[in-house]
Amino acid sequence: MSTGDFTTADERLREVMETPRRAYLPLPDTQVIERPGWLQLVTPSLRQGGLNEVAFSALDEREADAVIDETIELYRRLGLRFRWTVGPDSRPADLAERLARRGLLPFETHGMIRGTEAIPIEAGGDVTVEEVGERTVEEFSRTLAEGWGMDPGPIEAFNRLVIASPAGRHRLFLARYRSAPAGTASLVAFERSVYFLGGVVLPAFRGRGLYRALVAARLRYAAERGIPYATIHARASTSAPILERLGFETLCRFPIFTNG
């Protein structure tokens, strides 16, 4: 799909890698740690993941080991699951190796982009997708938590904050199969792109077109509002191959590390 309106390849890559760093919506207990070459989130109330991450790290080689150790120890002491993104602009060059030596586990990720023009849907009437509001946020949160193996309580509290946010940049989507809740996804809207995240389909409903339908619904949301591009950080082993078949272009590959 065309993404030719961007002037340079660097501009496209920045939209994929830098813009999503501002996708977070902080909870009252979220600590945002930001300085030149560093962006980190710490949220003690979300122990199983979410708003606990190093989103950007460009470290001086001489201080890298100390910063890595301090960061890992912070999350360990608080008992938090976290992630560390090692994108193309991360430093030092061997940052991924340093994290791996400390026992963090990587998964390969594709930074992808697509225009928001529509894709054909073949799921039929059995599959529906709806935007989530106050009436369905509990059902959405329960489905998301089941899909990701998380406690639904903190997730629901966060999602209620999302739908109540006056900025309205974050949107939640619930997919159903024959009326049963079966999958979830979300997006964050920026000026030139929407950032896709949180897509999951429950195992019992996979292979029925629900993931495609969630992608299509979010593309339609963006297109109707004149937002020309969609971006995503997709797992190489799961969603990236599907998204490539749906017209997303991979601009870069990079690891994201987790502590379990």
PLM regions and their residue ranges:
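Short amphipathic alpha-helix that is part of the acyltransferase structural core
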Residues: 1-20, 55-56, 61, 110-111, ...
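N-terminal charged segments
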Residues: 1-76, 91, 154, 164
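Conserved beta-hairpin
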Residues: 31-36, 88, 94-105, 170-183
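A conserved beta-turn-beta hairpin within the catalytic core of GNAT-like acetyltransferases
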Residues: 46-53, 107, 189-197, 206
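Acyl-donor-binding surface of acyltransferase catalytic domains
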Residues: 62-138, 232, 239, 255-259
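Conserved acetyl-CoA-binding loop-helix of GNAT-fold acetyltransferases
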Residues: 64-72, 201, 207-220, 224, ...
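A conserved beta-strand-loop-helix scaffold within acyl/acetyltransferase catalytic domains
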Residues: 152-204, 252
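C-terminal appended segment following the main domain
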Residues: 216-260
